[in-house]
Amino acid sequence: MKLRPMQDRIIVKRVEEETKTAGGIYIPETAKEKPQEGEVVAVGNGKRTEDGKILPLDVKVGDKVLFGKYSGTEVKVEGQDYLIMREDDILGVIEK
Protein backbone atom coordinates (compact mmCIF):
# COMPACT_ATOMS: atom_id res chain seq x y z
CA MET A 1 0.00 0.00 0.00
CA LYS A 2 1.28 3.45 -0.87
CA LEU A 3 -0.43 5.36 1.92
CA ARG A 4 1.28 6.35 5.16
CA PRO A 5 -0.79 7.83 8.01
CA MET A 6 0.44 10.92 9.80
CA GLN A 7 0.94 11.40 13.56
CA ASP A 8 -1.67 9.49 15.63
CA ARG A 9 -3.70 8.25 12.68
CA ILE A 10 -4.05 4.62 11.69
CA ILE A 11 -5.30 2.84 8.59
CA VAL A 12 -7.77 0.01 9.11
CA LYS A 13 -9.13 -2.55 6.67
CA ARG A 14 -12.62 -3.69 7.63
CA VAL A 15 -13.15 -7.42 8.10
CA GLU A 16 -15.47 -9.09 5.62
CA GLU A 17 -18.94 -9.46 7.05
CA GLU A 18 -20.77 -12.77 6.85
CA THR A 19 -23.30 -12.94 4.02
CA LYS A 20 -25.21 -15.78 5.70
CA THR A 21 -26.74 -15.91 9.16
CA ALA A 22 -26.22 -18.78 11.59
CA GLY A 23 -29.64 -20.08 10.56
CA GLY A 24 -28.60 -20.25 6.90
CA ILE A 25 -30.39 -17.13 5.64
CA TYR A 26 -28.47 -15.05 3.08
CA ILE A 27 -28.32 -11.32 3.76
CA PRO A 28 -28.62 -9.06 0.69
CA GLU A 29 -26.04 -6.28 0.20
CA THR A 30 -28.68 -3.59 0.82
CA ALA A 31 -29.53 -4.99 4.27
CA LYS A 32 -25.98 -5.48 5.57
CA GLU A 33 -24.43 -3.07 8.04
CA LYS A 34 -20.77 -2.26 7.74
CA PRO A 35 -18.73 -4.16 10.33
CA GLN A 36 -17.20 -2.22 13.20
CA GLU A 37 -14.19 -4.50 13.31
CA GLY A 38 -11.01 -4.37 11.27
CA GLU A 39 -7.31 -5.04 11.01
CA VAL A 40 -4.70 -2.30 11.40
CA VAL A 41 -2.63 -2.15 8.20
CA ALA A 42 -0.55 0.99 8.90
CA VAL A 43 0.17 3.32 11.83
CA GLY A 44 1.56 6.84 12.11
CA ASN A 45 4.64 7.85 14.10
CA GLY A 46 2.68 8.81 17.21
CA LYS A 47 0.91 11.68 18.89
CA ARG A 48 2.86 14.90 19.38
CA THR A 49 2.54 16.45 22.84
CA GLU A 50 2.47 20.18 23.55
CA ASP A 51 6.17 20.13 24.45
CA GLY A 52 7.07 18.47 21.12
CA LYS A 53 7.63 14.91 22.30
CA ILE A 54 6.14 12.04 20.30
CA LEU A 55 4.12 9.43 22.18
CA PRO A 56 4.12 6.07 20.37
CA LEU A 57 0.77 4.50 19.51
CA ASP A 58 -0.64 1.57 21.50
CA VAL A 59 -1.92 -0.27 18.42
CA LYS A 60 0.37 -1.91 15.88
CA VAL A 61 0.09 -3.35 12.40
CA GLY A 62 -1.83 -6.63 12.46
CA ASP A 63 -3.98 -5.81 15.52
CA LYS A 64 -7.68 -6.65 15.25
CA VAL A 65 -9.60 -3.64 16.53
CA LEU A 66 -13.16 -2.50 17.28
CA PHE A 67 -14.23 1.04 16.42
CA GLY A 68 -17.35 3.21 16.51
CA LYS A 69 -20.01 3.03 13.84
CA TYR A 70 -19.18 6.46 12.41
CA SER A 71 -15.43 6.45 13.09
CA GLY A 72 -12.85 7.35 10.50
CA THR A 73 -12.82 8.53 6.92
CA GLU A 74 -13.37 6.02 4.14
CA VAL A 75 -10.77 6.03 1.35
CA LYS A 76 -10.09 3.79 -1.62
CA VAL A 77 -6.44 3.01 -2.45
CA GLU A 78 -5.46 0.73 -5.33
CA GLY A 79 -9.04 -0.56 -5.54
CA GLN A 80 -9.20 -1.49 -1.84
CA ASP A 81 -11.40 0.23 0.78
CA TYR A 82 -9.77 1.47 3.99
CA LEU A 83 -10.61 3.67 6.97
CA ILE A 84 -8.27 6.38 8.22
CA MET A 85 -8.92 7.21 11.87
CA ARG A 86 -7.24 8.54 14.97
CA GLU A 87 -6.10 6.10 17.61
CA ASP A 88 -8.69 7.69 19.94
CA ASP A 89 -11.44 6.25 17.68
CA ILE A 90 -10.37 2.70 18.58
CA LEU A 91 -12.67 1.23 21.24
CA GLY A 92 -10.61 -1.88 21.90
CA VAL A 93 -8.12 -4.43 20.61
CA ILE A 94 -9.24 -8.04 20.18
CA GLU A 95 -6.67 -10.24 21.93
CA LYS A 96 -5.79 -13.62 20.42
Swiss-Prot record:
Spans traversing the lipid bilayer: none
Name of the protein: Co-chaperonin GroES
One Pfam entry name: Cpn10
Lineage: Bacteria, Pseudomonadati, Thermodesulfobacteriota, Desulfuromonadia, Geobacterales
Taxonomy, superkingdom: Bacteria
Keyword check for Chaperone: yes
A GO term from the CC aspect: cytoplasm
Purpose of the protein: Together with the chaperonin GroEL, plays an essential role in assisting protein folding. The GroEL-GroES system forms a nano-cage that allows encapsulation of the non-native substrate proteins and provides a physical environment optimized to promote and accelerate protein folding. GroES binds to the apical surface of the GroEL ring, thereby capping the opening of the GroEL channel.
Keywords: Chaperone, Cytoplasm
SMART domains hit by this protein: Cpn10
Predominant place of localization: cytoplasm
